[in-house]
Amino acid sequence: MAKKSKVARNAQRKALVAKYAKRRAALKARIRDRTLSYEERRAAQDALASLPRDSNPNRVTNRCALTGRPRGNLRRFGLSRIAFREKALRGEIPGVIKSSW
C-alpha cells in the first residue's frame, strides 16, 4: 500500500487540474496565436506560469485504484500489475483469462 498522504496529494492534484483546465487551455491558445503581439503572448506566458504548479496535468501520477502503487500500472484497468494479476486469477475481471499455448 502506498502512503495515504501520497494518494491524497495525487487526488488533490487531479482536482486542481480539473479546476484550471479551461483557463490553462485558453492561455496556451493565446501563447500559440501568432496574430497577437509579442507583449500579449508574453503576458499570457506569465499568467500561465503564475498558475499553481500542481494544476499542470504532467504532475498527476497514474496510481493503482486498490493499492495506490505508482509504478507498473495498466491504464486499461486502472490497477497495478500485481493487483491486476490477483484479481484476474480470482476471475474478478470480466473477459480476462489466463493464457495457455
Swiss-Prot record:
Keywords: Ribonucleoprotein, Ribosomal protein, RNA-binding, rRNA-binding
Region annotation Disordered: where it falls in the sequence: 47-66
GO MF annotation: an example: rRNA binding
GO biological process: translation
Pfam families: Ribosomal_S14
Record-level GO cellular component terms: cytoplasm; small ribosomal subunit
InterPro entries hit by this protein: Ribosomal_uS14 (IPR001209), Ribosomal_uS14_bac/plastid (IPR023036), Ribosomal_uS14_CS (IPR018271)
UniProt-listed PROSITE patterns: RIBOSOMAL_S14
Purpose of the protein: Binds 16S rRNA, required for the assembly of 30S particles and may also be responsible for determining the conformation of the 16S rRNA at the A site.
Subunit structure: Part of the 30S ribosomal subunit. Contacts proteins S3 and S10.
Stored HAMAP family: Ribosomal_uS14_1 (MF_00537)
Family assignment from sequence similarity: Belongs to the universal ribosomal protein uS14 family.
Annotated protein name in UniProt: Small ribosomal subunit protein uS14A
Organism phylogeny: Bacteria, Pseudomonadati, Myxococcota, Myxococcia, Myxococcales
